[in-house]
A protein has these predicted regions:
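Active-site-adjacent loop and "lid" segments of alpha/beta metabolic enzymes
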Residues: 12-38, 47-54, 59-61, 68-70, ...
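Phosphate/pyrophosphate-binding loops at sites that engage ATP/ADP/AMP, CoA/4′-phosphopantetheine
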Residues: 36-42, 129-142
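Acidic helix/loop microenvironments that form the catalytic cleft of cell-wall polysaccharide enzymes
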Residues: 149
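Catalytic domains of carbohydrate-active enzymes, especially glycoside hydrolases
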Residues: 1-8
Length: 234
């Protein structure tokens, strides 16, 4: 099963309508309150697994300020950390922070972004953003990096960063690889329906393990768990 459950109230897709701050807060609070109740239940036996950690996918500081608390273990911030506000809030609540690589504000298409030296740009980006997070009061152990597959990147950009993942691993922070059913898989396989990209997802899972990634964001947890189990036995 999953070690972390990642929830969000607003789709990251640029072709989906944005929701208001109040609506996002309301949706997230409703889930977090129910999650808190479930997580506090005593296990029926000693062998029962502990409940997964909770990650909340949001980026607007006005929302983050209202939903962070002891029930939230990780803030999945897709804003590329343009300032220190979300980092300060995470430090205040001792919540881990996931920093995603991208450009510009979320929900705005960046389909024509051109990169010169993508991996160097990403390394410089993460060095700058992790410095902001550490200065805000977070420890290195509380920071996770996300290369932002498909975000402000073309097919060849995505393939390059997947081939050169070791350059991000060497930065010394845990790396999350969001591989599940991604557009780059559909482009490689010529498959438009994301639900039919699970085989490609497993290929990227095995590749990510080989490269040294620490965490993987997936939809089909059972299939991916089985693949990881076999890989770990080899």
């Amino acid at each position: 099963g999953a070690d972390i459950i990642d929830i969000g109230a607003e789709s990251a897709r640029t072709n989906r309508e944005a929701i208001s701050i109040d609506e996002e807060i309301s949706r997230l609070r409703s889930f977090i309150e129910q999650w808190h109740t479930i997580r506090d239940l005593e296990p029926k036996d000693k062998e029962q697994l502990s409940p997964p950690l909770l990650s909340v996918n949001t980026w607007r500081p006005e929302v983050v300020e209202q939903i962070l608390g002891p029930e939230v273990d990780l803030l999945n911030d897709m804003s590329a950390l343009p300032d220190n506000r979300n980092a300060l809030l995470c430090a205040k609540h001792q919540t881990s922070l996931l920093i995603m690589h991208s450009v510009g504000q979320p929900k705005i298409p960046h389909t024509h972004q051109q990169w010169r030296g993508l991996m160097k740009s990403m390394a410089d980006f993460f060095e700058e953003k992790t410095a902001i997070a550490i200065e805000a009061g977070l420890s290195r152990e509380q920071i996770i990096l996300d290369p932002g597959l498909d975000f402000a990147k073309q097919k060849e950009d995505n393939l390059l960063l997947l081939r050169e993942l070791n350059q991000l691993i060497h930065l010394g922070f845990p790396l999350l690889l969001p591989i599940s059913r991604k557009t780059v898989i559909g482009e490689a396989l010529d498959i438009e329906d994301p639900r039919k990209r699970d085989a490609g997802t497993l290929a990227l899972l095995a590749h990510g393990v080989h490269k040294g990634a620490h965490l993987f964001r997936v939809h089909n947890t059972e299939t991916c768990w089985q693949a990881l189990k076999v890989l770990s036995a080899l």
